[in-house]
């Protein structure tokens, strides 16, 4: 169930679902697994807010275990395409594809709450049973290409070398807020609405 907010206006009461009310303040909630429907919703909100006023920041709150690479990269490409600055605020976790999205916010405007976590690792994929050997080779080659592309994005977003990203992402690499700041994925830790 989605909570409803009731506001008093000069024309009487107006009710909004909470996400529509947040959108009015240029806040987008990216929560749950990254998949096509969620990505389409996030992209539509980014485009709408940018068309409304591209001189104001958009606030993207992130709490996701990650998910689809193609859906996540569609969000990242849209963030880079629009003129509005996109502030990212990680709460809970930004894991896997969530790290790519959260670290792709406008440099200087990437934040994290003190108890949130970041996770980087190599992309996952596979083939089902009954897959032909040739198809397995194609999938393996595509996974390697995807890994290189994601490592380049993480390197650009953090300032770390691709070699360092490759080494750290070999297995699950968890970071708390302080470690994420030191790594270069965020620009500050937010505590009580203040930057640390």
Curated annotation (Swiss-Prot):
Belongs to the peptidase S14 family. HAMAP family: ClpP (MF_00444). SUPFAM superfamilies: ClpP/crotonase. One of its GO terms (biological process) is protein quality control for misfolded or incompletely synthesized proteins. CDD domains: S14_ClpP_2 (cd07017). It catalyses: Hydrolysis of proteins to small peptides in the presence of ATP and magnesium. alpha-casein is the usual test substrate. In the absence of ATP, only oligopeptides shorter than five residues are hydrolyzed (such as succinyl-Leu-Tyr-|-NHMec, and Leu-Tyr-Leu-|-Tyr-Trp, in which cleavage of the -Tyr-|-Leu- and -Tyr-|-Trp bonds also occurs). GO terms for cellular component: cytoplasm; endopeptidase Clp complex. It is an enzyme of class 3 (hydrolase). It is found in: Cytoplasm. Cleaves peptides in various proteins in a process that requires ATP hydrolysis. Has a chymotrypsin-like activity. Plays a major role in the degradation of misfolded proteins. Its EC number is 3.4.21.92. This is ATP-dependent Clp protease proteolytic subunit. Keywords: Cytoplasm, Hydrolase, Protease, Serine protease. Fourteen ClpP subunits assemble into 2 heptameric rings which stack back to back to give a disk-like structure with a central cavity, resembling the structure of eukaryotic proteasomes. Signal peptide: none annotated. The active site is at 96 (nucleophile), 121. The keyword Protease applies. PANTHER family: ATP-DEPENDENT CLP PROTEASE PROTEOLYTIC SUBUNIT. InterPro entries: ClpP, ClpP/crotonase-like_dom_sf, ClpP/TepA, ClpP_His_AS, ClpP_Ser_AS. It comes from Streptococcus uberis (strain ATCC BAA-854 / 0140J). One of its GO terms (molecular function) is ATPase binding. The gene is clpP.
């Amino acid at each position: 169930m989605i909570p409803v907010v009731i506001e008093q206006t000069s024309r009487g009461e107006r009710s909004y679902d909470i996400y529509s009310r947040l959108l009015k303040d240029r806040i987008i909630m990216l929560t749950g697994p990254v998949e096509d429907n969620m990505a389409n919703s996030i992209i539509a909100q980014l485009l709408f807010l940018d068309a409304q006023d591209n001189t104001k920041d958009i606030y993207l709150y992130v709490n996701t275990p990650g998910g689809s690479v193609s859906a996540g990269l569609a969000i990242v490409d849209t963030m880079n395409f629009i003129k509005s600055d996109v502030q990212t605020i990680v709460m809970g976790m930004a894991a896997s594809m969530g790290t790519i999205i959260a670290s792709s916010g406008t440099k200087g405007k990437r934040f994290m709450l003190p108890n949130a976590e970041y996770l980087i690792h190599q992309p996952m994929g596979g083939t089902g049973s009954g897959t032909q050997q040739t198809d397995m080779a194609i999938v393996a080659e595509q996974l390697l290409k995807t890994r290189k592309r994601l490592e380049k994005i993480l390197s650009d977003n953090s300032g770390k070398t691709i070699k360092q990203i490759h080494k750290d992402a070999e297995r699950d690499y968890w970071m708390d807020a302080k470690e994420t700041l030191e790594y270069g994925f965020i620009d500050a830790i937010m505590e009580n609405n203040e930057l640390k």
